[in-house]
UniProtKB/Swiss-Prot annotation:
One of its GO terms (biological process) is regulation of transcription by RNA polymerase II. This is Zinc finger protein ZIC 4. Pfam families: zf-C2H2, zf-C2H2_15, zf_ZIC. Residues 36-66, 289-309 are annotated as: Disordered. A zinc finger (C2H2-type) spans 135-169, 178-205, 211-235, 241-265, 271-295. Keywords: DNA-binding, Metal-binding, Nucleus, Repeat, Zinc, Zinc-finger. It is found in: Nucleus. PROSITE patterns: ZINC_FINGER_C2H2_1 (PS00028), ZINC_FINGER_C2H2_2 (PS50157).
Amino acid sequence: MRLGRVCPRGPGKVRSPRHRFSCTLFVSTTGSSCGHHGPQLAASSNPSVLPGLHEQPPQASHSRPLNGLLRLGIPGDMYARSEPFAPGPMARSDTLATATALHGYGGMNLTMNLTAPHGPGAFFRYMRQPIKQELICKWLGDDSPMSPRPCSKTFSTMHELVTHVTVEHVGGPEQANHICFWEECPRQGKPFKAKYKLVNHIRVHTGEKPFPCPFPGCGKVFARSENLKIHKRTHTGEKPFRCEFEGCERRFANSSDRKKHSHVHTSDKPYMCKVRGCDKCYTHPSSLRKHMKVHGRSPPPSSGYDSAITSALASPSLESGREPSVACSAAVVVRGTDVSE
């Protein structure tokens, strides 16, 4: 069964503003047991079949009966899809056939009340309304130390949730212990040394990101001001971190990139291929990513602005169970030049 709309418009007629919204919702009954082309439902069908759905402006009453169409008088906001129908009127008294034809479409729930007090189309206007977002506070209360229950208060905006957590749960400067009691927090009661660190941590649970990038068209937002500061350097080109090795003039936007670069000047090659039988290792993760294309794989993603030297890359291969090869420990020092493969 298909839904769509048709707008009766004769040749040379101009639709008025009211007539523009008198489009007809039709129900295609092709393939039903009531005939080759389905039941023929005229515009004048008995309103008792679908109460309240036959209220139409006077302009629509002059249109001729439509084969296979059911006039519902709903404003034309629905997607229209045309389908050929065989001609042929239907008697006004054929209400029983109409009810029988609609009996098999219980899943469509065509007899729902779409009328008063808002008139036709109120149901579809309601369905188009955006779903309101509910933010729930999951801070565990201290009313029952043995089995604490979450606060469970709901809020419609992030600002309301953050204000509630800050005022009602985190407390002011008089708070001695800076502990996160959010439900299922992985810190498990381990305190922070300062309140601002607790506030930054709570954003992991609430999803708050109060630091937007000020550059037009960027649109990125961050939970911490430090991350925003680092990000803005991608727009300004600032590189305040200079390589600490003498004779190297390389500069970087953040300290983690400088740390990754420093392996060029040492014997350390912590980025090791974990494919069984491969002994390649590199001084920089970008070199490892290029190498992994040979195997048709991708290494684990880096951790953003944090240190990219992860235990997964620095440790021996878990697949092969082998130790780092001698080549990974060999000292290759060429100042100012990237010698990674």
